[in-house]
From Swiss-Prot:
Protein residues bound to Mg(2+): 103, 242, 244, 246
Cofactor: Mg(2+)
GO CC terms in record: cytosol
The protein's name: Phosphoglucosamine mutase
Length: 447
């Protein structure tokens, strides 16, 4: 059974345009309700969270209508980070968790992510079954069994307490000035509150969401503003989250950015030294830098490569019994603490290292020399298949041959946007850039 709607992180697209329409959300809610309510002898419930996008309310209402029409009870959260849904779904004994978010994408986009009763994202197979149900005639509940919907007003505060509980109780953040950029997204209340309650001097940015400014010139994909603020106020460190707060990048006191690879390198070494790194293995995607792989090898730590997408990182972690993984983009997954990437928890663990060791962010955050890497994206029309074009395949083959023995090449279709991503790594930057430019040119000609 194959998936067409679902990508690497649920369903995503431009709001009010297929597939992110109220009609599709309604059918998805009904299909998911039907799937999880197959045993009608017990009450069933679903938790729904959302970020701060204007379209989130439309999609939330459509999902709620679909779910309740099949007899599911719906628990509605205020805007919360994605990991809060992963936490609260099992806590509230729900069959299903839903997060309405397009993560780091612009406000015009939105998405739907599905979580199982254990708080982990649903497998490809379950998503495929739900998608198949969407195309079928879905039986509705009798009038007396229609589900109910209610708001859960303390969900965000339950999440805040959980995040704080991951910070060592013997440590405090007193004397530490922290810039936190919440991307005008889901963590705009939680992140400053957590840091303040733990004692930090908090300089908050991106905490004025208006429904249209999420990720706009801020957050983990645009850390320049936070870097400037750090230099302006003399902060010790910066934490930049994305729109749903499941990814993070850090900024040291000089304004230099540390991506997910650098963050994972620090945690992997510390945990390995302490005997906490299960299997002495880090799970990361094929996008992670070769420099990370070399650093881990020097520390006798195994790098387990996965497909792109934090869900595939988590699947590999669960299959192998590992407890640390993530992506270069900033998804940091620590299954000792959470079921999915949690930017705020990852940021707190970094602050704990600063306090525990007395070392600066710049000392802790840059553990290896990155191999030069270039990544370029080419947008294409939905439904097109530029990678199938003979000229593109020839350019890829030529690039692979030129980089043989001196670098690596990765070309893939994004699972969340209509983009072809062309990435190369090599010590010879001129060669690497030329290879990428040739392939990008061929893809652009094909679209």
């Amino acid at each position: 059974m194959t998936r067409k709607l679902f990508g690497t992180d649920g369903v995503r697209g431009r709001a009010n345009t297929y597939p992110m329409t109220a009609e599709i959300a309604l059918r998805m809610g009904a299909a998911a309700g039907r799937y999880f309510r197959r045993d009608s002898s017990i009450a069933h419930r679903v938790v729904i969270g959302k970020d701060t996008r204007l379209s989130g309310y439309m999609i939330e209402n459509a999902l709620t209508a679909g779910l309740t029409s099949t007899g599911m009870n719906v628990l509605l959260l205020s805007p919360v980070p994605t990991p809060a849904v992963g936490l609260l779904t099992p806590s509230m004994r729900a069959d299903l968790g839903i997060m309405i978010s397009a993560s780091h994408n612009p406000a015009e986009d939105n998405g739907i992510k599905l979580f199982g009763p254990d708080g982990f994202k649903l497998s490809d197979e379950v998503e495929a079954e739900i998608e198949a149900l969407m195309a079928s005639d879905i039986p509705l509940a009798p009038a007396a069994e229609i589900g109910r919907a209610k708001h859960v007003y303390d969900g965000l505060f339950r999440y805040i307490e959980r995040v704080k509980s991951t910070f060592p109780t013997e440590l405090r953040l007193d004397g530490l000035k922290v810039v936190v950029d919440c991307a005008n997204g889901a963590a705009y209340r939680a992140a400053p509150e957590v840091l303040w309650e733990l004692g930090a001097d908090v300089v908050a940015m991106g905490v004025e969401p208006d429904g249209l400014n999420i990720n706009l010139g801020c957050g983990s994909t645009k850390p320049e503003a936070a870097a400037a603020k750090i230099r302006e106020v003399g902060a010790h460190v910066g934490i930049c989250l994305d729109g749903d707060a499941d990814r993070v990048v850090l900024i040291d006191e000089t304004g230099q950015v540390a991506d997910g690879d650098q963050i994972m390198a620090l945690f992997a070494k510390r945990w390995a030294d302490e005997g906490r790194l299960k299997g002495r293995t880090l799970a990361a995607t094929v996008m992670s830098n070769l420099g990370l792989e070399r650093f881990l090898a020097d520390e006798s730590i195994v790098l387990h490569r996965t497909a792109v997408g934090d869900r595939y990182v988590v699947e590999a972690m669960r299959a192998g019994g590992f407890n640390l993984g993530g992506e270069q983009s900033g998804h940091i997954v620590m299954t000792d603490y959470a079921t999915t990437g949690d930017g705020l928890i990852a940021g707190l663990q970094f602050l704990a290292e600063m306090v525990r060791t007395g070392q600066s962010a710049s000392t802790l955050a840059h553990n290896f020399e990155t191999v030069p890497q270039v990544l370029k994206n080419v947008r294409f029309d939905v439904g097109a298949a530029p990678l199938d074009a003979p000229a593109v395949q020839a350019a890829i083959a030529a690039g692979e041959e030129r980089l043989t023995g001196s670098g690596r090449l990765l070309i893939r279709k994004s699972g969340t946007e209509p983009l072809i991503r062309v990435m190369a790594e090599a010590e010879d930057e001129a060669l690497m850039t030329a290879v990428v430019d040739d392939i990008v040119g061929a893809v652009e000609d094909a679209v």
